[in-house]
Amino acid sequence: MLKNLRETMRTAPIVRRGTYNYFIHPISDGVPVVKPELLREVIACMVKNADLDVDKIVTIEAMGLPLGAALSTMTDIPFIIIRKRKYELPGEIAVHQTTGYSRGELYLNGINKGDRVLIIDDVISTGGTMKAVIKALEKAGAVIKDIVVVIERGDGKKSIEELGYDVQTLIKIDVDENGVKILGCIDEECQ
């Protein structure tokens, strides 16, 4: 099922910043080009595996945007974007995030107490952003029904599971100076 995702991961360029090897991929970076067949494949896999008995889909700016829009369109479930910009709307919740490579503020709007939500994102690595999102949703009184992330790298998934939440990832990778190594896939057809 994830043929395009696997192939584009295997051929993803690597950029070294300090001691960290970054992979550059259409799903996580929007470059070189996000092909519709890749996005369609990823969203079809999400539809197949996610708990869609929810009121809202929650995603994170920036690369969660195409995922959220596509999944919302496919399922008719409205989506909310956790933004990097403060709007100062009533009920806005600041999300304090710290990752392995950055820290900052994100802002949550449009969640009501009791909303059942599905969180989706492009990548989980340290888990810092996802932890902050979960805490903000809990503070708002939302019920987190499922968490689905396209790409898993590092130990971030474990840190979220320690909070009592399962995280489904479509593909698990490791990255070094030689490239991306695929460690597993949700569809078991990784080779």
UniProtKB/Swiss-Prot annotation:
Cellular compartments annotated: Cytoplasm
Main subcellular localisation: cytoplasm
Disulfide bonds, paired cysteine numbers: none
Keyword Cytoplasm included in the entry's annotation: yes
One GO biological process term: IMP salvage
Alphabetic keyword roster: Cytoplasm, Glycosyltransferase, Purine salvage, Transferase
EC number: 2.4.2.8
Catalytic function, reaction form: IMP + diphosphate = hypoxanthine + 5-phospho-alpha-D-ribose 1-diphosphate; GMP + diphosphate = guanine + 5-phospho-alpha-D-ribose 1-diphosphate
Highest taxon of source: Archaea
Gene Ontology CC, one term: cytoplasm
Pathway participation: Purine metabolism; IMP biosynthesis via salvage pathway; IMP from hypoxanthine: step 1/1
MF-aspect GO terms: guanine phosphoribosyltransferase activity; hypoxanthine phosphoribosyltransferase activity
Pfam families xref list: Pribosyltran (PF00156)
Subunit organization: Homodimer.
The family this protein is said to belong to: Belongs to the purine/pyrimidine phosphoribosyltransferase family. Archaeal HPRT subfamily.
NCBIfam families recorded: HPT_Archaea, PRK02304.1-4
Job description of the protein: Catalyzes a salvage reaction resulting in the formation of IMP that is energically less costly than de novo synthesis.
Listed name of the protein: Hypoxanthine/guanine phosphoribosyltransferase
